[in-house]
Design a protein with these regions (language model features):
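Metal-dependent phosphoester/phosphodiester hydrolase catalytic core
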Residues: 1-196
Length: 196
């Protein structure tokens, strides 16, 4: 944490207009993918004692999530970016696993861990009039039209950066393997070709 914090402080010393935190916010792999115990719960997975058949929020699962994720996120970010907008993307470790073809698609419980970690510790992407309706994990709720995986960073007419995480719809293990969901691919192509 100390090294990552120094790197962030160094970046902030340049007074950026915005910051993108590009995933791997937590390291708490539930399974091990090498050696004799491949596919089995890791030491951290056993320690967390998650009830994979139960929901994440409420009870022991929420407590285990907070004990694992909180100490890795809160001390690092805290109020450091209170004057600089920060956009959070998720990566493999944020789904509580190291990247492996054996882990896709992301198991339901681990997807719920990732979603809950995001809801508790870093914001979803704000509404965007140019974001396609129907993108996966983008919803309309009492909190507005938020997206867990797709956002846009704009700097006037100079720059538009499309931010996206395809990990939740990535499927490399089946005959119908897909890297980009068709709706996501269309959104990326439309925004890239757009002049507005």
């Amino acid at each position: 944490i100390a090294i990552r914090k120094r790197i962030l402080q160094r970046g902030l010393s340049f007074a950026p207009q915005a910051t993108i935190a590009n995933g791997d916010h937590i390291y708490w792999d539930l399974h091990t993918w090498q050696g004799e115990q491949a596919g089995e719960l890791s030491a951290q997975g056993r320690q967390s004692n998650f009830d994979f058949a139960n929901r994440v929020l409420g009870g022991s699962n929420e407590m285990a999530l907070k004990l694992a994720a909180g100490p890795q996120i809160v001390p690092l970010y805290g109020t450091t970016f209170r004057s600089t907008p920060i956009y959070f993307l998720q990566d493999d470790h944020d789904h509580w696993e190291n990247d492996s073809p054996l882990t896709y698609p992301v198991p339901w419980f681990q997807l719920q861990l990732a979603r809950t970690t995001q809801q508790l510790y870093y914001p979803e992407f704000l509404p965007d009039a140019n974001r396609s309706v129907g993108l996966p994990y983008s919803t309309t709720s009492e909190r507005g039209e938020l997206s867990e995986s797709f956002g846009t960073l704009r700097y006037g007419d100079l720059l538009e950066v499309l931010l996206y995480d395809v990990r939740r719809t990535l499927n490399v293990g089946d005959l119908n393997s897909v890297f980009l969901d068709r709706t996501v691919e269309n959104w990326l192509a439309e925004r890239t070709a757009s002049t507005d």
